[in-house]
Amino acid sequence: MLPINNNFSLPQNSFYNTISGTYADYFSAWDKWEKQALPGEERDEAVSRLKECLINNSDELRLDRLNLSSLPDNLPAQITLLNVSYNQLTNLPELPVTLKKLYSASNKLSELPVLPPALESLQVQHNELENLPALPDSLLTMNISYNEIVSLPSLPQALKNLRATRNFLTELPAFSEGNNPVVREYFFDRNQISHIPESILNLRNECSIHISDNPLSSHALQALQRLTSSPDYHGPRIYFSMSDGQQNTLHRPLADAVTAWFPENKQSDVSQIWHAFEHEEHANTFSAFLDRLSDTVSARNTSGFREQVAAWLEKLSASAELRQQSFAVAADATESCEDRVALTWNNLRKTLLVHQASEGLFDNDTGALLSLGREMFRLEILEDIARDKVRTLHFVDEIEVYLAFQTMLAEKLQLSTAVKEMRFYGVSGVTANDLRTAEAMVRSREENEFTDWFSLWGPWHAVLKRTEADRWAQAEEQKYEMLENEYPQRVADRLKASGLSGDADAEREAGAQVMRETEQQIYRQLTDEVLALRLSENGSQLHHS
């Protein structure tokens, strides 16, 4: 950084004489502003950066993370990028007309000044904005999430990406598309939007609109689903959720939420145990999740469900690692609809079983471990199928799609971790034919791919390390010998064959491929040996219907 001399004088005819205000005017104003600093502000550093920007005629000015409560009125007139994020700003001064990118996230702004006519990127998320000024026609991207905005001004035709999550919007802006080729992605999740304007259909089918967790009326949802399901629909893809966006953010103490799942004669002891976990990360959201779980279809209709949850909670209380994993999995489950809670319960049961397998529960029961692995494999394939299905839908709640495949195929595919009922299957877009095709695909891929998958599965490796230490050590030695003797040549041969010798990115990719192939070969051989021995001893079999 250049040393700053407040008495520095510029030579005559410098470029500074051509911009608004003189060099001395800038320095004098900035020095005065610096002297008015509040405790904790790094205005000295800010002034140093301002002067350096002016001296070097830089087009970027970065004053972020300096705990500033204000900015000087006269910013360098030549800048095209201004970053003042993560300060304590309540307002911004007049902005240079040359500005193209404005970053002012995580401040305390309640309003914005007039925006420069050439502005292309506006990033003002996490502020206290209640409205926006007119948006320039040049604007391409805008993030206004986590503010208090009630309505939006007209959107520029050029705007490609808009993030307006977590505001107080009650309606969407009007969309006018015409022949505009811009592919747009707009996020309006978690607002107060209750209806969708017909103008949304003016957008191209390559565009995406996200409106999850809004209080959309059932009439609006039905109308949109009917319209977007039409064979001649060519509008945008619309992501929604069955949540009404009105989840209660209040929660009761963790111990109270847990003890509610236990019989009265156990509640005192359970409460005492769980009081110790009140301050663990995500404990509050886990408490809210348990209360939401008690109101799901499965909790109301499935015999033994409460006992199942209580047994699971006992296991969590005995394992800090499992509890930490489970709290994290449940962290976002209360921010969406009932079926999101149900899908999270599925994932929590998977987490429990995989944890138990890794900790040794199935060390002496290879058949049970294979069954668990097979279920995890089937669930992975169903997730792939659900992901592909989501891409085909124009009006989609992703949660309902993922849960639909698990719930509707739980019995046929023997999915012990899947709930047997869901509330909103009707809006999932998953048809009976989709389910038949999915079942056939799972069985086909299981027949051809499961043993390879199982040989690389982490819990199986944990079992091998504990119970087949010598064989595991031999396999690891074989792998490292290959890395030392064969790996470099195999990577070089692959790069040469593809004409990419000397390409660093291609070398990394080729190296990863060779490593995967080597591990697949070595661990598959080890798996075949161990399974052949164990399954012949207890009469189990690798393939399962």
Swiss-Prot record:
It catalyses: S-ubiquitinyl-[E2 ubiquitin-conjugating enzyme]-L-cysteine + [acceptor protein]-L-lysine = [E2 ubiquitin-conjugating enzyme]-L-cysteine + N(6)-ubiquitinyl-[acceptor protein]-L-lysine. The LRR (leucine-rich repeat) repeats are involved in substrate recognition with target proteins. Its EC number is 2.3.2.27. This is E3 ubiquitin-protein ligase ipaH9.8. Effector E3 ubiquitin ligase that interferes with host's ubiquitination pathway and modulates the acute inflammatory responses, thus facilitating bacterial colonization within the host cell. Interacts with IKBKG (NEMO) and TNIP1 (ABIN-1), a ubiquitin-binding adapter protein, which results in TNIP1-dependent 'Lys-27'-linked polyubiquitination of IKBKG. Consequently, polyubiquitinated IKBKG undergoes proteasome-dependent degradation, which perturbs NF-kappa-B activation during bacterial infection. Mediates polyubiquitination of host U2AF1, leading to its proteasomal degradation. Residues 253-545 form the NEL domain. Keywords: Host cytoplasm, Host nucleus, Leucine-rich repeat, Plasmid, Repeat, Secreted, Transferase, Ubl conjugation, Ubl conjugation pathway, Virulence. Residues 251-545 are annotated as: E3 ubiquitin-protein ligase catalytic domain. Exists in an autoinhibited state in the absence of substrate protein, due to interactions of the leucine-rich repeats with NEL domain. Is activated upon binding to a substrate protein. Also interacts with human and mouse U2AF1 (U2AF35). PROSITE patterns: NEL (PS52053). Signal peptide: none annotated. LRR repeats lie at residues 57-77, 78-99, 100-117, 118-139, 140-157, 158-179, 182-203, 205-228. One of its GO terms (cellular component) is host cell cytosol. Belongs to the LRR-containing bacterial E3 ligase family. It is found in: Secreted; Host cytoplasm; Host nucleus. One of its GO terms (molecular function) is ubiquitin-protein transferase activity. Residues 243-250 are annotated as: Linker.
